[in-house]
Amino acid sequence: MSILKIHAREIFDSRGNPTVEVDLYTNKGLFRAAVPSGASTGIYEALELRDNDKTRYLGKGVSKAVEHVNKTIAPALISKNVNVVEQEKIDKLMLEMDGTENKSKFGANAILGVSLAVCKAGAAEKGVPLYRHIADLAGNPEVILPVPAFNVINGGSHAGNKLAMQEFMILPVGADTFKEAMRIGAEVYHNLKNVIKEKYGKDATNVGDEGGFAPNILENKEALELLKTAIGKAGYSDKVVIGMDVAASEFYRDGKYDLDFKSPDDPSRYISPDQLADLYLGFVKNYPVVSIEDPFDQDDWAAWKKFTASVGIQVVGDDLTVTNPKRIAKAVEEKSCNCLLLKVNQIGSVTESLQACKLAQSNGWGVMVSHRSGETEDTFIADLVVGLCTGQIKTGAPCRSERLAKYNQLLRIEEELGSKARFAGRNFRNPRIN
């Protein structure tokens, strides 16, 4: 079915910043998609087009990206009479029209908004759920419910505390279903709130951008200790493991790392990549840490390679790989990490996201689907993670509606699948081998 109309507009993300929303109409109805945006962005990401007009939204408006959709992309796609089930064809058309390496002409936010809306319309055209359509596009005969990685303690660029490392996550791998994983996650979250309140006072339970707590602690080990205590109090020490997103590029300074980067600069406290690696090894030894994302700077390839070779845990590339097939290919060759963080807005189209995922999976990597810190109520990534069978998703704490929107959609998908529902559980790194 061809596209009747496409209309983009500025809406607001969860941080009160403008973002792009796209309405796409076919004979089957209206299909709407909204684009997220990140706070700690990798320098190699596709370009998110902002207006940079300081008199409006402090320069963060997206009226240019919206205009590119309404004035250029929409008329072109409508005149070409393309069928919405032809995801790759439509994405390629937009990429050719943009003509730049990093989507800087239209903006990844313009292209992605249309691409997501097309995918939703394609599912309706086929009369199947979105996750099934995505599975078909990726060539997956079955679908898998993911283990949720709940970001329950926030630091780094997401929080006003002194904590350098950005996310401390809990993964309920011992659950039997996604629904049970949600219950375990919520119960640990509420126990954690009480633990933090008792130790640091009530204002320490204010939440960060992704719904996690941001107590004013400096030591990263203290965050792990809080998690360990909360998991124990909830009674799930045998079912919950820990993941971290260090976002080390945020505190990389001249070949070294500053674990107190939110205080006045003092080069004497910087540590070497080897010292930082030793710190991680201590975390893995003393806590149930099974996954570390962005342990080093996005260009510190040697440190990545050395660390990944020395551990058996999941090492996730985000700023390193930015969902970009060229960066992923280099990381595969260098054995820099063993898991891809998949963010649709880093690469900027559904087709390229699928390609990035398949490239990682075909090389034996894990894949974790991810939200961004600036989110909307759009639930596309919930269907994406099920269709791509990656087995793991991070989309914040079980708090804040823009986070719960995704988790609640996953609950609905599991319910809809009924007896056919499969939950990744302890096989979250490679869920297809059961």
UniProtKB/Swiss-Prot annotation:
It is an enzyme of class 4 (lyase). InterPro entries: Enolase, Enolase-like_C_sf, Enolase-like_N, Enolase_C, Enolase_CS, Enolase_N. GO terms for biological process: glycolytic process. Its cofactor is Mg(2+). The active site is at E210, K343. Keywords: Cytoplasm, Glycolysis, Lyase, Magnesium, Metal-binding. CDD domains: enolase (cd03313). Mg(2+) 1 binds at S40. Binds two Mg(2+) per subunit. Required for catalysis and for stabilizing the dimer. It is found in: Cytoplasm. It comes from the Eukaryota. Pfam families: Enolase_C, Enolase_N. This is Alpha-enolase. It catalyses: (2R)-2-phosphoglycerate = phosphoenolpyruvate + H2O. Pathway: Carbohydrate degradation; glycolysis; pyruvate from D-glyceraldehyde 3-phosphate: step 4/5. Substrate binds at H158, E167, E293, D318, S370, H371, R372, S373, K394. Homodimer. GO terms for molecular function: magnesium ion binding; phosphopyruvate hydratase activity. Mg(2+) 2 binds at D245, E293, D318. Its EC number is 4.2.1.11. Belongs to the enolase family. GO terms for cellular component: cytosol; phosphopyruvate hydratase complex.
